[in-house]
Amino acid sequence: MKVIEVKHPLVKHKLGLMREADISTKRFRELAKEVGSLLTYEATSDFETEKVTIDGWNGPVEVDQIKGKKVTVVPILRAGLGMMDGVLEHMPSARVSVVGIYRDEETLQPVPYFQKIVSNIDERLALIVDPMLATGGSMIATIDLLKQKGCKQIKVIVLVAAPEGLAALQAAHDDVEVYCASIDQGLNEKGYIIPGLGDAGDKIFGTK
């Protein structure tokens, strides 16, 4: 499984700001979108381009355009919504598929409760977005679902990943690619990433 920890200074700086204990909902939400946007830039760096002739201001001109890439952005509810707009800034025509999965706080197991997937998922690259890859359970369940629907190309974009979650994802789906802003120390006894970001969903939606 390909894992890319993006070490760009802007990514590291913005992620560091997100770790502050007393960060406001507004600021956390803004930064989640910004870091998500920067990670998308990296995750799409292998897109193929082709030469196309267009009408320029002074006549025909040959330009590069992305070669027929169909994409669906897949935010995992609810926290993934906080990163979605940052991805769509770069690909405003991308379709959006939504998967609702929450983690049972006692068993730490993923519990699916909603899905709305584009009909031609088998023709599209899926960019799954979620702030945290902790145990990996929710991500694995989401990828299971997408593959059951016929999806063949999947990339994962997360702000912070735990080594335990990456190992679990590797064991379940070694054909995906993961792009993250940080691989953190690990999980505590409650399954939270340390140092992590806290509860990203609560911070994005102001429900903490």
From Swiss-Prot:
Catalytic reactions on record: UMP + diphosphate = 5-phospho-alpha-D-ribose 1-diphosphate + uracil
Enzyme category, top tier: transferase
Function: Catalyzes the conversion of uracil and 5-phospho-alpha-D-ribose 1-diphosphate (PRPP) to UMP and diphosphate.
The family this protein is said to belong to: Belongs to the UPRTase family.
Residues where uracil binds: 193, 198-200
Activity regulation details: Allosterically activated by GTP.
NCBIfam families: PRK00129.1, upp
EC number: 2.4.2.9
Recorded metabolic or biological pathway in which this protein acts: Pyrimidine metabolism; UMP biosynthesis via salvage pathway; UMP from uracil: step 1/1
Amino-acid positions noted as binding 5-phospho-alpha-D-ribose 1-diphosphate in the UniProt annotation, renumbered to this chain: 78, 103, 130-138, 199
Keyword terms, alphabetized: Allosteric enzyme, Glycosyltransferase, GTP-binding, Magnesium, Nucleotide-binding, Transferase
Primary gene name: upp
Source species taxonomy: Bacteria, Pseudomonadati, Pseudomonadota, Gammaproteobacteria, Aeromonadales
InterPro entries registered for this protein in UniProt: PRibTrfase_dom (IPR000836), PRTase-like (IPR029057), Upp_B (IPR034332), UPRTase/APRTase (IPR050054), Ura_phspho_trans (IPR005765)
Protein's recorded name: Uracil phosphoribosyltransferase
Domain of life, per lineage: Bacteria
Alphabetical list of HAMAP family matching this protein: Upp_B (MF_01218_B)
